Each structure stands twice: as structure tokens, then as C-alpha cells.
Regions:
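A conserved FAD-binding loop/helix module that cradles the flavin
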Residues: 518-537
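A glycine-rich dinucleotide-binding beta-alpha-beta segment and adjacent secondary-structure elements
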Residues: 36, 205-212, 216, 220-229, ...
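Conserved redox-cofactor binding core of oxidoreductases
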Residues: 3-17, 135-260, 480
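Short, glycine/acidic-rich hinge or "gate" loops at secondary-structure transitions
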Residues: 73-74, 165-176, 471-477, 545-554
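Mid-to-C-terminal "cap/lid" subdomains and adjacent gly/pro-rich loops that border
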Residues: 253, 289-408, 412-414, 543-563
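Glycine-rich loop(s) and the adjacent beta-strand/alpha-helix scaffold that form part
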Residues: 57, 61, 68-78, 233, ...
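N-terminal glycine-rich phosphate/pyrophosphate-binding loop and immediately adjacent elements
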Residues: 8-155, 276, 298, 315-338, ...
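Flavin (FAD/FMN)-binding glycine-rich loop and adjacent Rossmann-like elements that form
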Residues: 120-124, 189, 203, 210, ...
């Protein structure tokens, strides 16, 4: 049998790949399809992988499905940008709107571990006021969560991932020291530092989910620079090498190359399992609860694709909001040429950061905020950027690439506002499984444009103050995907409650970036994992009361077990 992870499932017959030992295996509990498990989880990234771990450790029986392959980082990942495109979700999707999104490498992964397998490891907490941005800051929507409670879950995730970060963090409430020391700054990070200091604002080392010291069988970062193309040393603390091994050890089953197609609903209106495609055919895994954690495009796609006579608009969609309020984050950049060699690709791509404009609410003409970080693009990505953003080709492109080692850049992660017109719907076209593909509609609002203009102007000044020449701006880029199944405290204006539980179907849960009411000006992965940890705790509490599949306001209780 072929061991090509793109063609043949690896997690099967009672074993799964050992991500820490080449060619090694670890035991894995397996369930029959007709054996109802406590939870089927669709997706194994920051939301699903974390939740699978926590629920299994709490004693629930868990089967986690992922459409992507089960990679062995030590063997499958190479210092080859073209080869590593296998990490990205590149299935057909339609895009439209005034600002159609470029989907793939910058915002969605397809692998056990989800997008964390190729993420840039930036691990930041939300500003506390963002959880009540409508009430406190006058825009967006309030979260049904308290920042103080989230602070405890942030700490749990930072410890679980051994985040490497500064001794003190300049913004927000006091927090514990990061578990591991910060990574040393490369030359690109020092350019950011010089620019910030020249303009009188604070900066610091970026908190990163990559090891600065050994951890068990995982080696510290060797600064090879291919972080977003897959870490071949296991220094990157993705879900694949953190939560998933813990989930397996606790008794969870992982099924790779398992594409979920439809959630089944029984005669009582409860979900009863998931239809999925694996090894050439369709299967049905029975479950007492279903969690959708496919990220902000695949999650609404699955919910909408599971419409029934009872739920004609799709599952969990009595509010009509499934698929709506899609939010990306602005990811524009400013680039310049320095006299000294920078070699910005040496080390993780974002070693220094400022959150100044996330925490300052005056002297700006937009709502929300943004962080900006140093950048370290790899050669192929840099050539593609030159061709796409500046139209360079042939001799001009070759000439530009000769200055590659002298280039420094600053790039934002900026907050884009929720808008119902930005949405995921189902197209008429179908994919290789016969499933309708998603149509993704996206347009910037005026506030988004003002934020981008402000950020580009400020970063231009910062780069100029740091000594850059030949400065140019990259005006059209986005990152991350959130929204489309927002949480809230009112079933008329949200899809799930604060516990990520569907208002409509009590044994259907959503646990990923889809539940974000707003997106903030920081990378979302730490918040997604914190929400997953909280959701696991809430599920355990509900189970202990015997209310795991009880309809809201009903008297009957269907209990399941938990330690």
C-alpha cells in the first residue's frame, strides 16, 4: 500500500503516525461507524484539534475527521516552497464581491492540524475591550464572553504550546511570563525596532508558538525560515504536534483524508452523525454530538449542505446568519531596500511587533485597530509578490530579485468589520465529491479602507525613519478567515451561544474561528484555541448535569459520561 499521505490514509487499523519519530507509530483507539460515539468533530485545527484533545482527556469518546492528510513533519516537509503547497486548501471555490479574496496559502490549510501546520505562529491575546467592542468602543458586536475568563484560557494555551515571548508585554493587562524566552531578533526585526523608536512608539519581541529551547522530543527552532511552508524540525507548536498527540494518548480517533459531506438529523430534530468520504466511498459515523470546526468557509458550507425538510435553510440557521459576517484581516505591507544586508528569511517571519494602534483609540479616523510586524518572505513568495503587486516580469523581475537580501518589510494584521454582505453561500457547481462548492463574497467597507490607508502611511514613515530607500506599498492582501457562525447571547442575532452550542439543535456545536463576532487586530489562532478549551470545560459541566442533548426548556435529559 502506498504511503503517499495525499492518497492513502495513515491513521487506520489501530495506529496513527508518530510525528516525533521517523517511520514510527502510536496506538490509536478505533470505533466502528455504527458505534455511536460521544462526539464527532469535523476538523482538527486550532478549534477541532484542541477540542478533540480536551474532550478525550475528559473521558468522552471522540472521532475527529479531517479532509487533509496526516503529515509526518520530519519526513514530509521540505525546504521547498513549491513542494509545500500541499499544505494548503486549494479545492475549487468561487470568489466575488468588490474585493474578491485570494484563498489558499495565506488563510486556509488542509491537513491534520489544519491551518496551524502552515501558520506563522504569531500568538497574541485579544485586547480586553474587544470582547465588548460595541458597548465600550462603539463598533462591531459584543462577545458573550468576559475577558477575565478568557485570560485564564489564554494562559492555559500559552502553557500548552510553550509560547516563546518577551519577559513583559507592553500592552494590555498584566499577564504571566511566557513559558519560553523570546527568540533573538533578526535584522528585519531590528528594522521594525528602529522605526518604532524613531516615531516614539513601543515595540517588543513577537510571542511565537515555536520553541526557543528543547521540549521533549521536539527541537528548538533552527531559524531555517520555512515556517509557513511547514516546520521540518517540530519546533513549530502546531496542533499536529501538540493537541493531536495528546488526543490520541487520551483515546481519541483521528481519521485523515475524510471529507465531511453532510450532517444527519434524526426524527427528533437532533443530529445523529456525519456522512464522510474516505478511501473511495461514503461512510456514516454515528454520534451523540457533532462539532463543526472546519473554519470560516467549510463550516458554513457543511451546515448549509445539511439542510433538511425540517431545517430548510441549513442547520443552526434560524437566525439566517450562517455564512454571513465573514471577516478576513487586512494584511497590507510596506517594503523598502536597506543599505545593509537583511536576509529577512533567516528565522521566523515575524520576530518583532508593535500593537500601538490596537491600544490607542484617539488620533485615528477609523474604528478597530491593527498590529504590524517585521516580515521575512521566502524567495519564491517574494518573486510572486513582485509579479502580482508590481507587475514585474522578465528582466525587471530578475533585476529586482538581486536586491532581495537587502529588503525589509512591515506588514499589518488589521481588523476588518463584520458585514452581512460578506458571506459564504453554496454555488451550483460541485466538487470531486459531488458536493456544492462554496461561493465567497467579500467587499471592504469604508472603515476597512481608512484603516488600511492609515496603516500604510504610518508604516511608510516607520520604514523611512529606519533608513529604507525605494519604498513601495503592497495594497491588496488579506489573511485569516473568521465569522460566518457568530456567537452571541440572543438566538435571533447569533448562531451559537457563549459555549459554542447551536441555539437550534442542542447536540450540534461549532468551535473554530467561525464563531467570532469581531476579529480584532491580532492573529486569531490563540483565541480559537482558548475558546476550544473553554468549550470543553462547558461541555463537561453540561454533561455532569445530564443535559448534553436536552432541548432548551425541555424536561427530558440524555446523559453521557465524563470524568
Amino acid at each position: 500500500m502506498s504511503d503517499d499521505p495525499l492518497q492513502t490514509p495513515r491513521a487506520r487499523q489501530g495506529r496513527a503516525p508518530d510525528v516525533f519519530r521517523p517511520g514510527g507509530w502510536v496506538p490509536m483507539r478505533c470505533h466502528r461507524d455504527d458505534e455511536p460515539v460521544d462526539f464527532v468533530i469535523v476538523g482538527t485545527g486550532a478549534g477541532g484539534g484542541t477540542l478533540a484533545c480536551k474532550l478525550a482527556e475528559y473521558g468522552f469518546s471522540v472521532v475527529a475527521l479531517d479532509a487533509g492528510p496526516y503529515f509526518r513533519p520530519l519526513e514530509d516537509f521540505a525546504s521547498d516552497e513549491a513542494e509545500q503547497t500541499k499544505l494548503y486548501w486549494t479545492d475549487d471555490r468561487l470568489v466575488d464581491g468588490a474585493n474578491p479574496l485570494q484563498l489558499g496559502s495565506n488563510n486556509s490549510g488542509k491537513a491534520v492540524g489544519g491551518s496551524t501546520v502552515h501558520f506563522a505562529m504569531v500568538s497574541l491575546r485579544f485586547r480586553p475591550e474587544w470582547f465588548k467592542s460595541r458597548t465600550l468602543l462603539g463598533y462591531g458586536a459584543d462577545w458573550p464572553l468576559d475577558w477575565r475568563e478568557m485570560w485564564t484560557y489564554y494562559t492555559e494555551v500559552e502553557q500548552a504550546l510553550k509560547i516563546s515571548g518577551p519577559i513583559t508585554y507592553p500592552w494590555g493587562p498584566k499577564r504571566p511570563r511566557y513559558p519560553y524566552r523570546a527568540h533573538p531578533l533578526n535584522a528585519a526585526a531590528r528594522v521594525l525596532a528602529r522605526g518604532c523608536e524613531a516615531l516614539g512608539i513601543s515595540w517588543t519581541e513577537t510571542p511565537l508558538a515555536t520553541l526557543s529551547a528543547p521540549r521533549g522530543l521536539a527541537h528548538p527552532c533552527v531559524y531555517r525560515g520555512f515556517c509557513v511552508a511547514g516546520c521540518s524540525t517540530n519546533a513549530k507548536q502546531s496542533a499536529l504536534v501538540t493537541w493531536i498527540p495528546r488526543a490520541l494518548a487520551a483515546g481519541a480517533e483521528i481519521r485523515d483524508l475524510a471529507m465531511a459531506g453532510r450532517i444527519e438529523v434524526d426524527s427528533d430534530g437532533l443530529v445523529s452523525g456525519v456522512h464522510y468520504h474516505r478511501e473511495g466511498g461514503w461512510h456514516f459515523q454515528r454520534a451523540r454530538n457533532v462539532v463543526v470546526a472546519g473554519y470560516a468557509i467549510e463550516t458554513p458550507r457543511l451546515l448549509l449542505s445539511s439542510a433538511t425538510d425540517r431545517y430548510r435553510d441549513g442547520l443552526a440557521n434560524s437566525s439566517g446568519l450562517v455564512g454571513k459576517n465573514l471577516m478576513t484581516q487586512s494584511n497590507q505591507a510596506v517594503w523598502g531596500v536597506m543599505d545593509d544586508e537583511i536576509r529577512s528569511y533567516k528565522g521566523p517571519p515575524s520576530l518583532a511587533i508593535t500593537e500601538h494602534w490596537n491600544y490607542q483609540d484617539w488620533d485615528k479616523d477609523f474604528f478597530g485597530g491593527y498590529a504590524y510586524m517585521s516580515q521575512g518572505p521566502l524567495p519564491q513568495l517574494w518573486a510572486n509578490t513582485q509579479a502580482q503587486a508590481r507587475g514585474l516580469w522578465g528582466a525587471p523581475l530578475v533585476g529586482e530579485m538581486t536586491s532581495y537580501n537587502h529588503v525589509a518589510g512591515l506588514k499589518i494584521v488589521g481588523e476588518m468589520l463584520p458585514q452581512e454582505r460578506n458571506r459564504v453561500t453554496l454555488a451550483d457547481e460541485v466538487d470531486q465529491y459531488g458536493l456544492r462548492i462554496p461561493r465567497v463574497t467579500y467587499s471592504w467597507c469604508d472603515n476597512d479602507k481608512r484603516l488600511i490607508d492609515h496603516a500604510l502611511g504610518f508604516m511608510h514613515r516607520a520604514l523611512q525613519a529606519a533608513g529604507a530607500k525605494d519604498i513601495w506599498v503592497q495594497e491588496d492582501d488579506t489573511c485569516h478567515l473568521n465569522g460566518t457562525a457568530r456567537m452571541g447571547d440572543d438566538p435571533r442575532t447569533s448562531v451559537v451561544d457563549a459555549d459554542c452550542r447551536s441555539w437550534d439543535i442542542p447536540n450540534l456545536w461549532i468551535c473554530d474561528g467561525s464563531v467570532f463576532p469581531t476579529v480584532g487586530g491580532v492573529n486569531p489562532s490563540l483565541t480559537i484555541q482558548a475558546i476550544a478549551c473553554r468549550t470543553a470545560d462547558r461541555i463537561r459541566a453540561v454533561a455532569r448535569r445530564g443535559e448534553l442533548t436536552r432541548r432548551r426548556g425541555a424536561q427530558t435529559k440524555v446523559a453521557t459520561h465524563a470524568t
